[in-house]
Amino acid sequence: MAHAFFLGVDVTPADGDGAPDVTHTLFEKSTEGAGEPATYRLNRIRDHADVASADDLADHLQGLVADQPYIGRTSLIVNRGAAFGAALVGALEDRGLDPVAATLTDEGGATAGAPDEVGIHLGGGDVLRRFVNLHRDGRLRLENHATEAASRLARDVQALSERLDEIDGDMEALGETQTDGLSFDPGATHITSAALAVWLGSERSFDPSQRLKTSPQTDAGA
């Protein structure tokens, strides 16, 4: 059985002088054998409502990886859309963690960032649809967690799945192909951090040294 770990971090911009809302979510990608579809199991999810600085959070994430030998080669992806997110990318890079810097857009598709960075521009709705489709296919494992953050993630993913069923059913009845429809909520850090982690996992093999694909995808086939 092959394993790999992927950590997604999302940030909601702070209101006024308050601290930003931050969530990090860790998924384990595994497969039973060659040719078998990968599954993604929630390892942990945590909300941070009182982060003092990007450096403090980077220290915490570095400690999380260092204290868990079995996830020591975890691949990270950070939503850098907010100023705090961009600062966190820099702080993680300073610590040698080499995160993927994601910029979420309202447009569809995915494009690589600048040649000199590990970055990506992603359609937020596409990332969300891929995540929900994996849940619909039974390839997400969100159970066996007692925290409120994990319970909220499971509830909201199920609600999104039911909404997507309705959307796709309406489109089928009209004889049309569904291209969008899910509403991407920039404030739902628990959903975004999880969706980013799983997106990165679906774009990379079980070799943690692998870079992003030259032509990243947004469907749910990986």
Which residues does each PLM region occupy?
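Short alpha-helix plus adjacent loop in nuclease-associated cores
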Residues: A101-E148
